[in-house]
Amino acid sequence: MSRIAYGDESIRRTGVPEPMYLLGVYIADDEQPDLADALSVYVRHAGKLHWRDHLPQTKLAVCRTISGYDASHLVVVASPLILDGGEERARQQALFCLAVHLEDKFNVHALVLERRQRSQDNKDENTIDVARRSRVLTQEFRLTHKFGRDDKRLWVPDQVVGALGDYAAGQDTGWQMIADRVL
C-alpha cells in the first residue's frame, strides 16, 4: 500500500490569542476513494480550491464532505510567531516535526508540499536533508513541491488548516465536523 502525504500551510495573526503557523497534511491512501475528487465541486476560481475564497455556507459544506471520508489528516501548529515575520522559521520547525511523525507514526515516506518561491522550497529541502543526516528520517523519505493547480490533493490540507484557523479565531466554520479526523 502506497501512502503519500499532501501538505499546505496557513498563517493566522488576527482574531487568535497568539499568532500561529499551521502546517497540515492529508494522507492519501490509494486503496480508498480520493477526497480531493469530492472537493472538486466547490472550486469557484479556475484551477484551485482556496479556503479563504469560500462563503460561510460553502465552508460548512466542505467540512461536511471531509467528515464523510475515512481519511487521515495531521496538523502541526507553531505558536507564537514573532511580531516581525517568523513564518519561515516556524514552517521549518513544523516541517521537521511533521515529517518525523509522518514516517514514524503513519509509515509515510513521501510528502508533497505546495510550491512556493524556489528559495523557500530549497529551505524545505534543506530541513528534510538535516533530518535525514541526523537519522531522524530514513534516506527513503522524499519531499517534492507541486503547484496547487497541478495536484488537487493539495487542496485538502488547505481546507483542513483553514477550518482549524477559523476555529482558533472563534469562527464556526465546520471545524467540529472534522476535528475527530485530525491529529
Which functions belong to the PLM regions below?
Residues 1-183:
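Phosphate-ester processing/binding pockets and catalytic centers
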